[in-house]
Swiss-Prot record:
Binds 1 divalent metal cation per subunit. Its main location: cytoplasm. It is found in: Cytoplasm. This is 5'-nucleotidase SurE. A divalent metal cation binds at D8, D9, S38, N91. It comes from Anaeromyxobacter dehalogenans (strain 2CP-C).
């Protein structure tokens, strides 16, 4: 099996190395950002050149985003030898609920799916110090299932693993998390103000049965959530059929 690995924590991250070890015996290629890129979402570099450095055999660093890394991995490094699966992680911390909208880990996997390759994003929902081995092994086992039982269209599976041995897993839906939404103001030695987004506010996880948040944080199960690349809000789409915009003609739906 040929595997393309990436992440958002950087090419030298411990979680990425654990993932590579979990695919021992497979043909593993790594194309990852050259530095930490957490919460970079699906940003792609269109207005500056990118550099690609082979830091070890089949192990590449890109001076760009996680999306840049997977894009270059599929369209340059492995252009003539498509991988069977793209796996992103192991992320240092969870990507649950609305985290997926900000996550560079999830975005790297999503880029793989957008480019036609089944993909898995994996995160360890634990504070440091991190032991990534169990999360990496679970992700590798799941990735092999994806390759053995390929879906009709490219799939993206978002995996979150609690600390310790995986005693079980559940297929889940995305939960909902409420962030502190703080902006912390500081002053530098020259008297100028600067700001940190987020601060140290607590994150509230809504108690939603069947959600990834409940499975991982309350029941200590690994959560596997299939993410749909079509972001259309279907109930609102149906509602809009009854709307009119004054002064403009509405064309009938095809």
């Amino acid at each position: 099996m040929r595997v393309l690995l990436s992440n958002d924590d950087g090419v030298h991250a411990a979680g990425l190395r654990a993932l590579a070890e979990a695919f021992h015996g497979d043909e593993v290629w790594v194309v990852a950002p050259d530095r930490e890129q957490s919460a970079s979402s699906h940003a792609i570099s269109l207005h500056r050149p990118l550099r690609l450095l082979e830091v070890a055999p089949r192990w590449y660093a890109v001076d760009g985003t996680p999306t840049d890394a997977v894009y270059m991995g599929l369209n340059l490094v492995l252009r003539d030898a498509r991988p069977d699966v793209v796996v992103s992680g192991v992320n240092h911390g969870p990507n649950l609920g609305n985290d997926v909208l900000y996550s560079g880990t999830v975005a790297a996997a999503m880029e793989g799916a957008l480019l036609g390759v089944n993909a898995v994003a994996v995160s360890l929902a634990a504070p440091p110090p991190h032991d990534f081995g169990e999360a990496a092994r679970f992700a590798a086992a799941l990735a092999r299932q994806v390759v053995a039982r390929p879906p009709p269209a490219p799939v993206l599976l978002n995996v979150n693993v609690p600390p310790g041995p995986v005693r079980g897993y559940r297929f889940t839906r995305l939960g909902r998390r409420t962030y502190g939404n703080e902006v912390v103001e500081k002053t530098d030695p020259r008297g100028r103000k600067y700001y940190w987004i987020g601060g140290e506010g607590r994150v509230h996880n809504e108690d939603i049965p069947g959600s990834d948040c409940n499975a991982v944080l309350l029941e200590r199960l690994a959560a596997v959530t299939p993410l749909h690349l079509d972001g259309t809000h279907d109930p609102m789409f149906q509602e809009l059929r009854s709307w009119t915009v004054p002064g403009y003609e509405k064309e009938p739906a095809p």
